[in-house]
Amino acid sequence: LKPIYFREPSVNIGVGDNPGKVPHITGEDFRIRYGIGGGTPLDYALTYDDFVAHAQAYGKVGGLDRVATVLNAIRADRPDALLLDGGDTWHGSMTCLKTQGQDMVNVMNALKPDAMTFHWEFTLGSERVQEIVEGLPFAALGQNIFDREWDEPAELFKPYEFFERGGVKIAVIGQAFPYMPIANPGWMFPEYSFGIRDEHMQEMVDEV
């Protein structure tokens, strides 16, 4: 919610043939790959290089009030734009932990995204996720969120949502993080299974 001092990691290990390849590069290698000058705001925001000096020079980063300012500017310039929340939103701070995600839910509702999908949200537990989703004023999408017992799409999460912008009809298909029970405690959401489900995704593409 509030601006913080955030240091990017100094290590990102890729397995197999991936070490040293995007996205498994950090620091100077990252700057060189993307042509970012040393000591610049982007250097501070996207690498760990000389973090203390950069933090002293540039201050804290983030804060949803600043995100709102950017969103308002984009919407004023491009009113037909969609705002999509890719997940990892209802977690990560003490206030989020204490409120069971409600602080972030309130703020995201105020930002008025058009749709969202999921990742760490499920660490709140399936009952809390269901409670929040049932009250959302926007679409909660996940074509790959299935009922574990019946191996069928979970009714709570729509696979897709239609929008019309500038006379163009748009279908947004939700894809939650596929390895949820590996990256997060599976006992917190035993009712659900995930996975890539590429065949079901193709069915949804064909359907829309």
Kindly give the residue locations of the regions a language model identified.
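Acidic, metal/ion-coordinating pockets
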Residues: 1-208
